[in-house]
């Protein structure tokens, strides 16, 4: 086991063709599966399907990030999650995603103008130190949206079907709560 290196050669055209077809098929299945999950997540956000929102994000968190990615001073811990979520949302070419946008009486974490001109989503994120604080943090996020009137950004754009979403993160886990803004 020294510095020796070996070359690998595909022995003939038939074997090369089998490798090519299998690799292409694997890529197609992988891409389709990921795209399907992503589309399910976007739809879950639009519909307020908490179970699918959490399932997708928890899968991404467990497979994609390290707890070291979130090591920051306390006030900045949610930034990693914020950036991850903005990246996921901007993958939907039909949506206009706004990050840290001035809205109402403050700055909303994320506002999504969906492809439906009557609909939109306001998302507020929270980071907590322990898993048993997650539900309370989700409620706090929804309360913040209401108290600071972040939904006004979408209402001023004549969007009336507005979904509010509070998401709490703790290490590699998340919890979500959603509600529909009552129409006045």
Short names for language-model regions:
Residues 153, 157-184:
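Domain-level recognition of nuclease-like catalytic cores that cleave nucleotide substrates
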């Amino acid at each position: 086991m020294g510095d020796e290196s070996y070359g690998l050669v595909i022995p003939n055209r038939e074997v090369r063709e089998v490798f090519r077809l299998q690799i292409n098929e694997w890529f197609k299945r992988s891409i389709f599966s990921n795209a399907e999950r992503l589309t399910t997540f976007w739809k879950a956000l639009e519909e307020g399907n908490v179970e699918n929102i959490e399932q997708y994000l928890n899968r991404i968190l467990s497979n994609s990030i390290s707890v070291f990615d979130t090591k920051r001073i306390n006030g900045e811990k949610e930034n990693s999650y914020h950036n991850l979520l903005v990246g996921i949302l901007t993958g939907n070419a039909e949506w206009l995603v706004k990050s840290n946008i001035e809205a109402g009486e403050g700055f909303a974490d994320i506002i999504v103008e969906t492809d439906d001109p009557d609909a939109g989503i306001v998302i507020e994120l929270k980071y907590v130190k322990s898993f048993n604080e997650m539900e309370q943090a989700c409620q706090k996020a929804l309360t913040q949206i209401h108290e600071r009137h972040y939904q006004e950004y979408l209402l001023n754009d004549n969007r009336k079907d507005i979904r509010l979403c509070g998401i709490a993160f703790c290490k590699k886990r998340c919890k979500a709560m959603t509600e529909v803004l009552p129409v006045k």
